[in-house]
From Swiss-Prot:
Protein's organism: Pan troglodytes
Zn finger region (B box-type): 97-138
Function (record text): E3 ubiquitin-protein ligase which regulates the IFN-beta production and antiviral response downstream of various DNA-encoded pattern-recognition receptors (PRRs). Also plays a central role in determining the response to different forms of oxidative stress by controlling levels of DNA glycosylases NEIL1, NEIL3 and NTH1 that are involved in repair of damaged DNA. Promotes nuclear IRF3 ubiquitination and proteasomal degradation. Bridges together TBK1 and NEMO during the innate response to viral infection leading to the activation of TBK1.
Regions of compositional bias (Acidic residues) in chain numbering: 380-434
PANTHER family: E3 UBIQUITIN-PROTEIN LIGASE TRIM
Name of the protein described by the UniProt record: Tripartite motif-containing protein 26
Entry keyword annotation includes Cytoplasm: yes
Subcellular location: Cytoplasm; Nucleus
GO biological process, one term: suppression of viral release by host
Enzyme class name: transferase
Lineage: Eukaryota, Metazoa, Chordata, Craniata, Vertebrata
InterPro entries associated with the record: B30.2/SPRY, B30.2/SPRY_sf, Butyrophylin_SPRY, ConA-like_dom_sf, PRY, SPRY_dom, TRIM/RBCC, Znf_B-box
Pfam short name (any one): zf-B_box
GO terms, molecular function: ubiquitin protein ligase activity; zinc ion binding
């Protein structure tokens, strides 16, 4: 009770006479009375004159209103005493925990000194050090910073929303991609199952045809065997009778010689065809089907492997590397050989002696594929004539019957002369082997000046093609397919695998594979010394 009376007395001293509450931001007017700043603004002037004090009724000027800092600090201390009345000694109040206190005066910090950038209590604000400085209420000083923080917070929230949106969209894209992969998995299984079913049906169909041909051949074999046995039995009977007749005495033999011989006239012995013409035609057609099957499966396997394993690339030629003997098209995908050297300026990257040219695009990794088309005047006509000759030979073979008359055909002098002419033509073709072209890959750092061997040790992996056949440009040179002239050569480069594979792009037939360890950039390589021939890059 002793301590509560002084506290109540102090509370009465710091109570505003207008709002009857603690003085908030206390100010004094001209008469000396003290009120809350907000309460003085509510005091209205009487009959248009200056406002008057609510206690003494003396007029005052609002511009003379001055803050009372010490009284504001006293109000805070009274409030703290009132709160700390039931607190144990040494216990820190919640307000002291939540609010920072002035280290010097242990008062609550209310102001912010804009000159020093420090937080001040009421006593620091009235001190000689900070009185001439500009000090504002801490909440007012914090407002611009709070607005900046709120603006930055708004930006961060927008960024967060964007990230969440991106994340949601990305998650949706991933789920869609996974769904697409699942659909593709089902598609692959279904397509391959359909392909397997189709191949199984074709297999069963071919095996049924084969079984029918086997049955027809077996039945024909029995007929052929039975006919032969009957013919042999007939001949054996005639031979036996004639042998007996030949052993008779002359007198007996001469009695009915004419009649006997008339009973057994000389007949041409039977020469039957072991395979009927119809069956032979069917077997030939079946063999053609198997060849078509083999060719189709090879082409399918080659194309599927190429499309799935290798990336088909479009390559062009580098005009700066082209020899003066070569002429490039405007799109740099076609090269033609000219016998005259047309380059007026020798570029440092240009081939000077060898009629070669490199590709403009190089490869240092991956599996890539492109094709080179060889256009040679007269090749198509020659091949068509060759196809017609082969068809004629097949027709002649089909027209041949059985065993004939039991004699073999021997070569005549004319045949020997024709063979000799063919040998002379082969020798002439060997002499013309210099007219050829090369297709393949090469290191972009290969030598380009002087005479070159153009072999793997020089950084070139290529095939040489001519009218006489195909050679692998190895050391020594390896002849691959004599007289084979592919119109399109496929080049498959597996950089990491260290292989360069050449195929017939039309039939997918393997021609040759180089193996090496690649460490430099590789580019397409063409070499052409063959008048009337063009090399075109595809696609």
């Amino acid at each position: 009770m002793a301590t509560s009376a002084p506290l109540r007395s102090l509370e009465e001293e710091v109570t505003c006479s207008i709002c009857l509450d603690y003085l908030r931001d206390p100010v004094t007017i001209d008469c000396g009375h003290v009120f809350c700043r907000s309460c003085t603004t509510d005091v209205r002037p009487i009959s248009g004159s200056r406002p008057v004090c609510p206690l003494c009724k003396k007029p005052f000027k609002k511009e003379n209103i001055r803050p009372v800092w010490q009284l504001a600090s006293l109000v805070e201390n009274i409030e703290r005493l009132k709160v700390d009345k039931g607190r144990q000694p040494g216990e820190v109040t919640r307000e002291q925990q939540d609010a920072k206190l002035c280290e010097r005066h242990r008062e609550k910090l209310h102001y912010y000194c804009e000159d020093d950038g420090k937080l001040l209590c009421v006593m620091c604000r009235e001190s000689r050090e900070h009185r001439p400085h500009t000090a504002v209420l801490m909440e007012k000083a914090a407002q611009p910073h709070r607005e900046k923080i709120l603006n930055h917070l708004s930006t961060l929230r927008r960024d967060r929303d964007k990230i969440q949106g991106f994340q949601a969209k990305g998650e949706a894209d991933i789920l869609a991609a996974l769904k697409k992969l699942q659909d593709q998995r089902q598609y692959i299984v279904a397509e391959f199952e359909q392909g397997h079913q189709f191949l199984r049906e074709r297999e069963e169909h071919l095996l049924e045809q084969l079984a029918k041909l086997e049955q027809e051949l077996t039945e024909g074999r029995e007929k052929f065997k039975s006919r032969g046995v009957g013919e042999l039995a007939r001949l054996a009977l005639v031979i036996s009778e004639l042998e007996g007749k030949a052993q008779q005495p002359a007198a007996e033999l001469m009695q009915d010689t004419r009649d006997f011989l008339n009973r057994y006239p000389r007949k041409k012995f039977w020469v039957g065809k072991p395979i009927a013409r119809v069956v032979k035609k069917k077997t030939g057609e079946f063999s053609d089907k198997l060849l078509s099957l083999q060719r189709g499966l090879r082409e399918f396997q080659g194309k599927l492997l190429r499309d799935l394993e290798y990336k088909t690339v479009s390559v062009t030629l580098d005009p700066q590397s082209a020899s003066g003997y070569l002429q490039l098209s405007e799109d740099w995908k076609c090269v033609t050989y000219t016998s005259l050297y047309k380059s007026a300026y020798l570029h440092p990257q240009q081939f000077d002696c060898e009629p070669g040219v490199l590709g403009s695009k190089g490869f240092t990794w991956g599996k890539v594929y492109w094709e080179v088309e060889v256009e040679r005047e007269g090749w198509s006509e020659d091949e068509e004539e060759g196809d017609e000759e082969e068809e004629g030979e097949e027709e002649e073979e089909e027209e041949e019957a059985g065993y004939g008359d039991g004699y073999d055909d021997w070569e005549t002098d004319e045949d020997e002369e024709s063979l000799g002419d063919e040998e002379e033509e082969e020798e002439e073709e060997e002499e013309e082997v210099l007219e050829s072209c090369m297709v393949g890959v090469a290191r972009d750092s290969m030598k380009r000046k002087g005479d070159l061997s153009l072999r793997p040790e020089d950084g070139v992996w290529a095939l040489r093609l001519s009218s006489s056949g195909i050679w692998a440009n190895t050391s020594p040179e390896a002849e691959l397919f004599p007289a084979l002239r592919p119109r399109r050569v496929g080049i498959a480069l597996d950089y990491e695998g260290g292989t360069v594979t050449f195929t017939n792009a039309e039939s997918q037939e393997l021609i040759y594979t180089f193996t090496a360890t690649f460490t430099r950039r590789l580019v397409p390589f063409l070499w052409l010394k063959w008048p009337g021939t063009r090399l075109l890059l595809r696609p």
